[in-house]
Regions:
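A short, well-structured alpha-helix characteristic of acyl/acetyltransferase catalytic modules
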Residues: 1-52, 171-179
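Glycine-rich phosphate/pyrophosphate-binding loop shared by adenosine-nucleotide-utilizing enzymes
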Residues: 16, 69-73, 161
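Acetyl-CoA-dependent GNAT
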Residues: 40-98, 113, 169-173
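Conserved acetyl-CoA-binding loop-helix of GNAT-fold acetyltransferases
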Residues: 100-113, 136-140
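Short glycine/proline-centered loop/turn elements that form peptide/ligand docking sites
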Residues: 103, 107, 131-134, 151-156
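Conserved GNAT acetyl-CoA-binding A-motif
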Residues: 116-126
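Conserved catalytic-core motifs of GNAT/GCN5-like acyltransferases
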Residues: 124-127, 144-161
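Conserved active-site tyrosine of GNAT-family acetyltransferases
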Residues: 138, 143, 166
């Protein structure tokens, strides 16, 4: 990872942490994502494509870690203009960690930090329309559907796919079982 990580938070969740990658972890995480059938379907099977997430100047990447090691990644991009104080979020978990509530809990933890500590008033996320499991998880956290962006993102098959635009305002984060 070529970007500095000193500014990134370490956030403690229930059974997991969100933290910056440690030296040597990025290559292992990229390999895990690109070889995982579920994660690679959404994040890509090409290691160079996934590695770009870790190298983008405006994207901050945290690992979702358990005692067993990295379970996935969660990213955020901040808009720091005081008139548009918002952030975009994305998350990708390895297939053996999906369906256990970890993704929703990680999103909830990061959302609260972005609202309470970073002062954002709005968060956005933009899953593929076809990624119904992710959409349900985001709604459980408090994200609301606001529209569809047609042919928004090129998929692994080389064609453009629609994405669902979702947002959440400060004060709308839902606790477990509320969504």
């Amino acid at each position: 990872m070529s970007r500095p990580t000193e500014h990134l938070p370490v956030l403690a969740g229930d059974g997991f942490d969100l933290r910056p990658p440690r030296p040597g972890e990025v290559a292992r995480v990229v390999e895990a994502i690109t070889s995982d059938p579920v994660a690679s379907a959404w994040w890509g099977a090409d290691p160079a494509v996934v590695m770009r997430w870790f190298e983008e100047d405006d994207v901050d990447v945290l690992l979702v870690c358990t005692d067993d090691g990295p379970a996935g990644i969660i990213t955020y991009t901040e808009v720091n203009d005081p008139d548009y104080r918002s952030a975009g979020i994305d998350i990708g978990l390895l297939s053996d960690r999906i369906g256990r509530g970890m993704g929703s809990a990680a999103l909830r933890l990061l959302a609260r930090w972005l609202f309470e500590e970073r002062g954002h008033h709005r968060l956005t996320i933009d899953p593929a329309v076809a990624n119904e499991r992710a959409v349900r998880a985001y709604e459980k956290v408090g994200f609301k559907r606001i529209g569809v962006a047609r042919q928004y993102e090129r998929g692994n098959d080389g064609t453009y796919h629609d994405n669902l635009l979702m947002d959440m305002l400060a004060g709308e984060v839902l606790g477990p079982g509320e969504g």
